Amino acid sequence: MTIPRIRQPRAVIDRKALTVVLEDLAATVTDNRERRARLLAVLKGALGDGRAEVRRRFLEEKGTGAAVFAENSHLMDQIIRLLFDFTTTHVYPRANRTIGEQMTVLAVGGYGRGEMSPQSDVDLLFLLPYKATPLHEQVVEYMLYTLWDMGLKVGHATRSIEECIRQARGDLTIRTAMLETRYLWGDRALYGQLKTKFWTGVVTGTGPDFVEAKLAERDERHLRMGDSRYVLEPNIKDGKGGLRDLHTLLWIARYIYGVSDMRELVELGVLSADAATKFGRARAFLWTVRCHLHYLADRPEERLTFDVQPAIAARMGYTDRNSGRGVERFMKHYFLMAKTVGDLTRIFCAVLEDQQKRRPILSIATLLMRKRNLGDFVLDGGRLAVAGRGAFREHPLQLISLFKVAHDHGLDIHPDTLRLVTEHLPTVTLLRNDAKANALFMEILTSRKDPELALRQLSESGVLARFIPDFGRVTAQMQFDMYHVYTTDEHTIRAIGLLHRLETGALRDRMPAAADAVHKVQSRRALYLAVLLHDIAKGRGGDHSILGAEVAMRLGPRLGMSEEETETVAWLVRHHLDMSRTAFKRDLDDIKTILDFTGLVQSVERLHLLLALTTVDILAVGPAVWNNWKSSLLRELYTHSKDVLTSGFQAEARDKRVAHKREELAAALADWPQASRERYLDLHYPAYWLTFDSATHLRHARMLRRARDAGLTVAVEVLPDPERAVSEVLVATDDHPGLFSKIAGAMALAGVNILDAKITTMSDGGALDIFTVQTLEGHAIEKEERIARLAKTVRDVLTGDLPLEKALRRQPPRLPERTRHLTVPPRVIVDNQASKTHTVIEINGRDRPGFLYAVTRALTDVAVQISSARVSTYGERVVDSFYVKDVFGMKIVHRAKLAQIREALEAAITQTVPRKVEEGAEQGAEKADAGEIVAA
């Protein structure tokens, strides 16, 4: 292997001049310790100067990663050569070396490939003809200690030729390393002997074994790294679609074909010229990104974490545009390159598998398969293939039917056929208005056999983006936040697979309501198409739900949907966020919430469809997003809405319902003295009786009596509810302004998240506040010591024994430091239409310790009473919804008061002086109704 020639190499390091310096040093300094110190200073200075020049060229002259790799490799080569010559000539000189004392220094690994990034290790192999002699040991030790003292990380091995061959036969890692050795200095003939023996004694006849082992190694690495190239913070080296996948291609190509560059495979007919060009572009892009990453982190960092993504995007020229943020455009380019690597890896490795892996004995299943009707296709080695190279040109429909037949029969597609698909992608555009092609696609999408794999194959091959260009626009599209784990296309395909699992009952334990609802759906085709299209318009600079509905209206007829089906799909896409917004942000005990939602849905069929779509949409966001609490909220909204849609709203008189609830509790408290019972019933206002069920009323009554009997001024009880993965915290004390905010602050100190809160006041001036909480990890609080600690923290804060403000300032950040670049525009929405009795205030901001305390204290400071709250967290973004009244118990309607509230809340969200921001950001879903104030 050789490295490319670099521009003005002596500006990086001048070995000739340094040789003169070292010769003079050896001649004038006789003390060994002093001489070594001076040698170290010279080499360390040369290394530092060289690295600075390489960095300057890269950053100031907009250089490439390829140039950095070549320049760093050249720099290190000269350092090694200078050190070797000085060591063997002046430190351990030997006039007449025997054959057994010869030595060669080889570069190995990334250094051997000439891919030396700014923070790469230096991997060396000291090659000997026979067993190591004392001279060898002295030279190697002197060189290694000098390199270590220079601050280099050196991986090293000292082996004879026979040791190299023996170990390469038995160890795949060593065998792979031997593939990319590069001569540095010493006896060149020795290296020639090693190469000859390696290729004849190790490689010959072992190609199939090597291919199998490297592909298995690749698969294991993918599983270890998450098995997806579409993750928020990808590993550029070891992640799927990263540099290690390209290395795998190179290793196999070199092992099987003896090539050192992928372009040589074009001449051999293994790779197309276009594929070789794509390989080069992907590698060059990843090299450049990796160099920026190493320079920014100043360490061998391989993950594109949130904190470096914006900086790298800016350095590589990705600026913000109307169509999206620069960092999102950069990451989209990264994911597209990772996809390209995946495409190349799949096709090339499949070709090699087909050529090199031992062919399996034909099973009975395969023999029977040959008798099945595969249409226009044939089996080649057990894989589905076209009948001839002109098949797609003569019959373009086969570009779709290929995937349908493979899906129906559970067959892999032959690599040569996949390569032909890639070559004929422009032909797919001719199929967009072909009725048969659209019908075939809908059969794949709605297949009773899991359609996820077929859709993924259509996407990976590039066919899906050509067939539905709107899908191509969201391919590799990411959102720069912690909530959306996958790119839009990956999220969508996962959602389709989850919908299939929901239908089969595989998810029934986690989401029973949705599993029941999906089987009651009449418009199954509409549901699957709605899932495919629900995020189709993301990244277009407007409300993606509205824009997506327009796409659905256009695509539906093309895909063979009836007018009714098309309207259903468009409605689902338009409203695919409304069910989760209502369930997670609104008070489900407020009948107007239910009536407004059912007024939107209008039919049980649409309710079933929307629940199924909402469920798989949330599940497909990421593995940690769904939880039992969200499941219970959606189930509650679904159940209440279904009751209204099937039976109608029973507008029983308010007084009658209150009286009925009081009578039920009175009966349950039969063991209480009558006077005590009546006194307790009179404590609560009508709203309390209508908010909770009878079992909850009884639990509250017994808790308040225990507190009174114990003479407690502050009573706290924690009730775990593992089934919903939450705990209920009851707090009883005297009512006073700021009570809610103090409890919220105490919860933050105790390390729990508030999900829901109900604030009730009593006629004797007492307060009973009910909080639904989780641990920061999303679990119920069940351990006794954790329960006791939470209760004590709340009590100590309310009694004044624990100074709240001071304690909150000591709280560590909620989010990792690397996420500091993830900003959330402060947003305050005041809605006077959502409830008949309350003003609803929704707040969006960046999560931090004490966030809920800060905003509730701000509400207290402007004389706003909180009746209930709902808290949701989406990665770094927190959304709090409050049902509030003014000091007179009325909705807040005056513009001046609303403006005061907005300014106070905005200051609390940002922890800065309130500032006016432009309204109408697309991130905020709802628009202001009449009388609401929005701070975007």
From Swiss-Prot:
It comes from the Bacteria. Uridylyltransferase (UTase) activity is inhibited by glutamine, while glutamine activates uridylyl-removing (UR) activity. Its cofactor is Mg(2+). Residues 728-809, 840-915 form the ACT domain. This is Bifunctional uridylyltransferase/uridylyl-removing enzyme. GO terms for molecular function: [protein-PII] uridylyltransferase activity; phosphoric diester hydrolase activity. Residues 915-930 have a biased composition (Basic and acidic residues). The keyword Hydrolase applies.
